[in-house]
Amino acid sequence: MYAGRTLVYEDCRRDVEVEIGTDVLEGLSEPLGLLLESARWMAWRFGEEYRGALHEIYLSLVRKSGSTVVDIEPLWLQAEPLLIGSERRLLDKVRGAFQQKWSEVVSLNPDARSVQYSSAELRGRVAATFAAPRTEWSAARYHSPDVMIAAESVDAIRRGQYCFVLGELHVATNTMSAAPLVSQHPSPEDLFQAIAVDLRRPRVVPVLPKNAPVPRRAAPVLCSPEDFLLAFGDGAPGIPPARLLPASALVVEASGSDLFVRTRDHQHRFDIIEFFGSVLSGTIIDQFQLFEPMEHTPRVSIDRLVVQRESWSVPASEIAFAFERLDADRFLEARRFRQQHQMPRHVFCKVPVEVKPVYVDFDSAIYVNLLAKLIRRSVEEDREGARVTVSEMLPGMQELWLEDGEGQRYTSEFRIVALDLCEATEC
């Protein structure tokens, strides 16, 4: 992910226990429920768009071959740019519609520093705006929000002096399925049992080839014994034959207006979106972005939950301090830049040339120089419309409640897996 910065990981469990009271959980459930309702709509809409695109590919292959039964390989190859490649028109279309809907639910004043809503006043709007008839595939019943608590101490939380902060919301994904979280879990067998109960229908899970662009530590390993494992080529040692689906044994055909993938011997058949479900989940996992970036976006809170940090979006080529030749001038101009936009000292910056946001302390010449280098790289690589998004650091330095025995503070988040109780049929 980062060149030269991820050579070694230490995946371990810390000797600490955290218990969350019902009062705290109840304060989170209402606002988080609104976000999860919109996530269901997003996954459903993605499924519908991809269903249409896959049907178009199927019809083109039928016209080319003259047969209504099509091998899975050519369809997969033509669909791959939409699924895991650079063709983003379907992603952009659905994300744009999602953001437009949220702009109808809440009103953002770009001149305001923060906007506050209650879940009670938004509940009806969200239900009407994000009505979804069903979930499109089994794994889309999972959504995984990462939630932080901003508070100066545990005692402050007990006194009610805290707020929740939404880090990310991973759509159509169970983030507990990642290899380190399963291996470090105190009872991994409970995880496997839970997923078997949650998802009663078997899924189709692709076997990752050795050259897959997925870090081994991020690979999903939480599968039900009833799931089918899809293998291309010869890369499927150790898989029970009854659960193995060689790609060479699969074809696609239509039944009415629906597409299905089946084995050549007619033993197994899957709805086309259910078949591609695991791939779709990986495609849309990071598409939950409530609002289109604006020059200035206020902090947005629903009850105690901050769903959008205050942020600024600036064209990379217009950030003058990044192009100053002398360190002193660069540092001075960076402070002027921060003052002009009324940014806090501690921020995270998202630049086109990095996968993840980077931390910046505007009072540090070292951090300013590192940010300037990233901005120049973004401009030099001629990224079309390259913009830098700056977000407030929340929780802040004094809002890290988790301490060790020596009083050192640590950042932390609660990784939540929410299960949609609607099956992948009518909701």
Predicted regions: what is each one?
Residues 1-202, 402-404, 408-411, 416, ...:
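Type-3 copper protein
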